[in-house]
Each structure stands twice: as C-alpha cells, then as structure tokens.
C-alpha cells in the first residue's frame, strides 16, 4: 500500500499555468474556477530566484485562490528550479487555518473576495460579514 507521502511525491503536474501578473491569475479564476478541478501555478515561495523570471509570489497565488473558494495544497519543485503549487476548489466543511481566515477578512476589506469565495466561507461556517 502506498503511503500518503508517496502519493503526493508521485502526483503528476498535469495542468501547469504560468503568469507574470496577479491580474492574469485572477482572470483565469474568473473563467475557470467554477468548472476546473485543479491547476498548478508556477511560483516562488519567499525570494524570487533568478530562474523564476517573472513568475508570481506565493502570497499572490494563495490570496487569489481564496478569493474564488480555492485552496493551495501540494508544492513540488519543477526541473528548472521554480515551484509548482497545486490549487483546487475547497471542499465543504474543510478545515480553515487561522491565517487563511485572516487573509479572507483582509481580502474582503480590500474588495477582492468573490461570491464563490464567500460561499466557501459560508459552507465552512466561517462567515465574514461584509457590506453589499
């Protein structure tokens, strides 16, 4: 029987997206968040390595995912040194970290949350009050 770590390590990157600007990722979510089941985003974690070029920082990737009710999970290193972050829609009643709860409150205050992102919060009983 394969362990969970073996499954994650061997998980294939099937749909790698590369963006140079956060607005491009947001546009992708606007067009695909309701229908796609997963994607992988080329990104960097803390400091932009030279080999990353103009790929997105982690914070931009995770914030846009939260805005649309998606979550980051598996992280893999690409052959060229960049990282690939797996994103997928949140499951109902999934666990929310305190950090992601705070991020959503901040995103709501900045006017970036979408109805899909709010619905994911509602489904998890973590309603953020907002003005319409």
Regions found by a protein language model. Name each.
Residues 4-132:
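Charge-dense, helix-prone N-terminal extensions
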């Amino acid at each position: 029987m394969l362990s969970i770590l073996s499954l994650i390590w061997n998980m294939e990157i099937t749909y790698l997206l590369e963006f140079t600007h956060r607005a491009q990722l947001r546009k992708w979510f606007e067009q695909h968040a309701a229908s796609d089941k997963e994607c992988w985003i080329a990104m960097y974690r803390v400091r932009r390595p030279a080999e990353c070029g103009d790929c997105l920082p982690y914070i931009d990737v995770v914030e846009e995912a939260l805005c649309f009710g998606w979550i980051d999970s598996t992280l893999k290193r690409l052959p060229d040194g960049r990282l690939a972050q797996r994103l997928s829609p949140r499951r109902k009643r999934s666990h929310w970290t305190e950090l992601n709860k705070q991020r959503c409150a901040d995103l709501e205050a900045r006017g970036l949350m979408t109805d899909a992102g709010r619905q994911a919060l509602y489904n998890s009983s973590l309603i953020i009050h907002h003005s319409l």
